[in-house]
């Protein structure tokens, strides 16, 4: 990885390209694991804790052809005893959600991330549908299963204002109030990218309000970048980082970011990238780094 970084010679990996560099980086790691005749996750980190899946079940925003403002509505099976049970719980909820949508004459077409993309415009209605599906599947929302949101606020930001709940733009302070009310009303345990990537004051403010109870997840905020994560740690913005290896370009730099996060009490969520391949490397990475999700 160090050789690749030096060969490229640019901060943003513009000469060789981050995707090309990452492909060589991950392939080298796989070859090393094979040559040592050990599992990939053991070669990377030798951890044995399986993460909880965050299952994306309703799509909105740029990922769907509907009017939902929030980009991803997810479920997290908190009480699952193992990964197989976690997947089964999510599958049962998805089945019930599909039946509910059909019963309400709503589309079961899927968005870019595989979640349903019904023609609805209310964030609250999307949440209510998920809660009903959880109940019909025989689980208790807030105990067995938590709700997680990816707002993708970069897409809802204009002139220091946000259009998170409707086409009307409101201040960051009013947007914080909206999030706080959502979290009081519903069993939401994680909010990803609630604000624009450079609106640090809003990130800090929301983290102060929700830090003890809710995951405030930085994806666009941190972009798997050590410098941006350090700024977040120092300013106490967010408490969780979404990790995408192809945002930074090498496995070594990805591991450095994960280690920095863990050393400073930040949780890590290992994630694919929109339009990613079916390669399974990130599953091994999640286990190897003891990432909880």
Residue ranges and their predicted role:
Residues 1-2, 39-56, 88, 144-148, ...:
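Beta-strand segments within the central parallel beta-sheet cores of soluble alpha/beta enzyme folds
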Residues 1-38, 87, 115:
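Metal- or metallocofactor-binding catalytic centers and their adjacent structured scaffolds
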Residues 1-13, 46-54, 94-105, 135, ...:
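Short, hydrophobic/aliphatic alpha-helical segments
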Residues 24-32, 36, 73, 130, ...:
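Buried hydrophobic packing segments
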Residues 48-111:
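Mobile "lid/hinge" segments at catalytic clefts and subdomain interfaces of large enzymes
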Residues 54, 76-88, 119, 163-173, ...:
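Active-site mouth loops of central-metabolism enzymes
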Residues 72-83, 107-123, 152-165:
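Active-site-proximal beta-alpha loop/turn segments in soluble metabolic enzymes
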Residues 124-293:
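Catalytic core of soluble alpha/beta enzymes
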């Amino acid at each position: 990885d160090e050789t690749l970084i030096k060969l490229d010679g640019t901060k943003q990996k513009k000469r060789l390209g981050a995707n090309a560099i990452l492909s060589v980086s991950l392939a080298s790691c796989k070859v090393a694991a094979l040559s040592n005749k050990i599992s990939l996750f053991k070669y990377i980190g030798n951890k044995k804790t399986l993460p909880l899946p965050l299952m994306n079940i309703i799509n909105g925003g740029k990922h769907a052809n509907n009017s939902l403002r929030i980009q991803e509505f997810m479920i997290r099976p908190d009480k699952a005893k193992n990964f197989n049970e976690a997947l089964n719980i999510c599958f049962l909820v998805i089945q019930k959600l599909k039946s509910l949508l059909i019963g309400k004459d709503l589309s079961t077409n899927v968005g870019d991330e595989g979640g349903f993309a019904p023609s609805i415009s209310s964030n609250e209605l999307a949440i209510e549908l998920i809660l009903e599906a959880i109940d019909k599947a025989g689980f208790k929302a807030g105990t067995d299963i938590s709700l997680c949101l990816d707002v993708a606020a970069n897409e809802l930001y204009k002139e220091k204002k946000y259009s998170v709940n409707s086409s009307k733009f409101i201040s960051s302070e009013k947007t914080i109030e909206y999030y706080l009310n959502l979290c009081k009303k519903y069993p939401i345990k994680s909010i990803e990218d609630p604000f624009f990537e450079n609106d640090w004051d809003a990130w800090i403010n929301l983290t102060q309000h929700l830090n003890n109870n809710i995951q405030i997840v930085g994806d666009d905020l941190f972009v798997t970048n050590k410098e941006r994560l350090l700024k977040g740690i120092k300013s106490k913005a967010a408490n969780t980082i979404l990790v995408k290896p192809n945002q930074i370009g090498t496995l070594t730099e990805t591991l450095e970011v994960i280690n920095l996060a863990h050393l400073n009490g930040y949780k890590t969520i290992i994630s694919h990238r929109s339009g990613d391949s079916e390669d399974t490397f990130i599953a091994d990475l999640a286990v190897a780094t003891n990432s909880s999700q």
